[in-house]
Amino acid sequence: MFEHKIFKMDFAGRELSVEIGKICEMASGSCIVRYSDSMVMVNTTKSAKPRDGIDFFPLSVDYEEKLYSVGKIPGGFLKREGKPSEKAILTSRLIDRPIRPLFPKGFRNDVQVVATVLSVDQDCTPDIVAMIGSSIALSISDIPFNGPTGSVCVGLVDGAFVVNPNAEQREKSSMHLVVSGTKEAIMMVEAGADEVPDEVMLDAILFAHQEIKKIVEFIEGIVAEVGKEKMPVELYHAGEEITQLVREFATDKMKKAVQTFEKLERMENMDRVKEETLAHFEETLEDFEDFVGDIEEVLQDIIKEEVRKLIVHENVRPDNRKLEEIRPIWCETGMIPRAHGSAIFTRGQTQVLNVATLGALGDVQKLDGLDEEENKRYMHHYNFPAYSVGEARPSRGPGRREIGHGALAERALLPVIPSQEEFPYAIRLVSEVLSSNGSTSQASVCGSTLSLLDAGVPIKDMVAGIAMGLIKHDGKVAVLSDIQGMEDHLGDMDFKVAGTEYGITAIQMDIKIDGIDKEILQRALKQAKEGRIHILGEMRKTISQPKPELSPYAPKIVKMQINPDKIKDVIGPGGKIITKIIDETGVKIDIEQTGEVFISGIEIDMIKKAQELINNIVVEPEVGKTYKGKVSRIMNFGAFVEILPGKEGLLHISHIAHERVAKVEDVLNIGDEVEVKVTEIDEKGRVNLSRKVLLPKPEHKNK
């Protein structure tokens, strides 16, 4: 166990403290990070030996939201935390992405990072705290890690960059940017923005990197004082002799195979070379079974090297495109008859079907997490079935990748979604990947725009997305537009940029090497903007404006305003009144605290009927207005007349007629319909009526 130590630094005007050596003695690295009143405990562990038979680094990252951190008791029967929320999964990915490239190549030991949220201050979001804590826990542990990394959130408030904006500033901010990196370079970018210009986004990323350097320097000081010596590791790599033999036999064949234009044919050709190579060495090597893993590793290295050489030295991509060339695009809308909006977006061999569904405001997603936000009106879900890549495997629920891609596409469209006041509908978009050869998340962005327009949703502008790639080889750099699957897998960067003609709405960047500098970032953003404008032009050829009318199968919504004090009258005891209206008309009714009432249904006649029933409940008598009422009670001094449902007024005996009325029953009886005028509503809300003011005055005879 370490000696108990506390380290502190000023981080954007608030104290960031790191406590080490107090808890979790068995973990390889452990710390508690506190930023204001947000507190996260991070622990990291590793397996003693490498995992056999794998060709990847088995890293797992879990961000655990504990509802006690915000003083809540979980709902449901069990009253305990269940599966991770969408926000927790996205934060786990935020932690994972910048640290994964910084482990040694060939490291096969299992590594786990667990960030547990202990306390949440809404002014200091715990995700950044967890990202910093994960870097610290790995850096002070004996696990080989080429960090540390720092992470920071940047907002744009009134034209100025704000580091780690508080809750009020986040509401005003036109950008939410999370950047992670080392002292030398940027490793990861995640952003949502309100059409922020490309130059401003670049400045924000570089501004964030300056803050990251301060955090890294702080962590380096902690490591110097309490860091453990790194463990000796066994890194997997093929032997020199077998490497040379495989390269001599397979390099030329594989080089030819990777230049096949069509994806499935290219994969078949590469598999054929692999089978030929394995068959050759099965005949020539005595202990062939011991070398299968090495042979496959060398073949993969050959593929990677040959693709990268072709791109960097010959400017030739696997499908023969130029570095900045976008694949052919075609779009179609309205192909699903009963859907409220639908579109297919195809770019090369990547194809996505997007379907838009409109619902009543009661269909919003209810959220129960660590944030103060309670519901979500606009949703985007992304599905990636096995058939989209020509595979056969069981269909499970959405994984972290699907949730991450769906959230990115959702964030890209959010700035152009009309407000509830402009368009009082819940909106759900579903992207079904039909064929995948790279950049499906950005195809989902494009498909979402098209299906929203097809549904008649008055979005503020069209949004398109593009994925950029990077190859650094032999000291040369190539930036690729609209990367396909192989370029993504074998490249050094996956940089997704979505936006309108005027600015960026979402960014997601992952770096597989030791980061990128300003020049490369600037070049990638410029190329991405050119590609985005081209894609928007292709999309406009299919549809460029929202349809003037909603689908006949979409619910119709009528909005009305009532006095908030009358909400209880509309709902009734135990919901009796509103349930009766819903049963009678078949509509949905959603009532806001402000008194806004949204009535939705397919048949407009039923909506109007529900509106009339609600009006009858909430309408107030007005002085000077005439009503046709029914006599409900008779007293010796007058009659009570129900002029509105549940609302009576007094018709005094002296106001029944111009002539003297000796007895009320001489003129009126219970149940009689009578036309009356409201003459007064006193300070206690009592209504006085008159019948005689509506009757012609009798003519007086001359004496």
From Swiss-Prot:
Taxonomy, superkingdom: Bacteria
Name of the featured protein: Polyribonucleotide nucleotidyltransferase
CC terms in the record's Gene Ontology section: cytosol
Known role: Involved in mRNA degradation. Catalyzes the phosphorolysis of single-stranded polyribonucleotides processively in the 3'- to 5'-direction.
Signal peptide: none
InterPro entries referenced in this protein's UniProt entry, alphabetically: ExoRNase_PH_dom1, ExoRNase_PH_dom2, ExoRNase_PH_dom2_sf, KH_dom, KH_dom_type_1, KH_dom_type_1_sf, NA-bd_OB-fold, PNPase
Compartment list: Cytoplasm
Annotated ranges, domain S1 motif: 624-692
Cysteine disulfide partners in this protein: none
Cofactor requirement: Mg(2+)
Entry keyword Nucleotidyltransferase: yes
Reaction equation(s) it catalyzes: RNA(n+1) + phosphate = RNA(n) + a ribonucleoside 5'-diphosphate
Organismal lineage: Bacteria, Bacillati, Bacillota, Clostridia, Peptostreptococcales
Limits of the KH domain: 555-614
An annotated GO BP: RNA processing
The protein's Enzyme Commission number: 2.7.7.8
NCBIfam families recorded: polynuc_phos (TIGR03591), PRK11824.1 (NF008805)
PROSITE patterns: KH_TYPE_1, S1
Sequence similarity: Belongs to the polyribonucleotide nucleotidyltransferase family.
Gene that specifies this protein: pnp
Gene3D superfamilies registered for this protein in UniProt: GHMP Kinase, N-terminal domain, K Homology domain, type 1, Nucleic acid-binding proteins
Keyword Membrane: no
Record organism: Clostridioides difficile (strain 630)
Record keywords, A-Z: Cytoplasm, Magnesium, Metal-binding, Nucleotidyltransferase, RNA-binding, Transferase
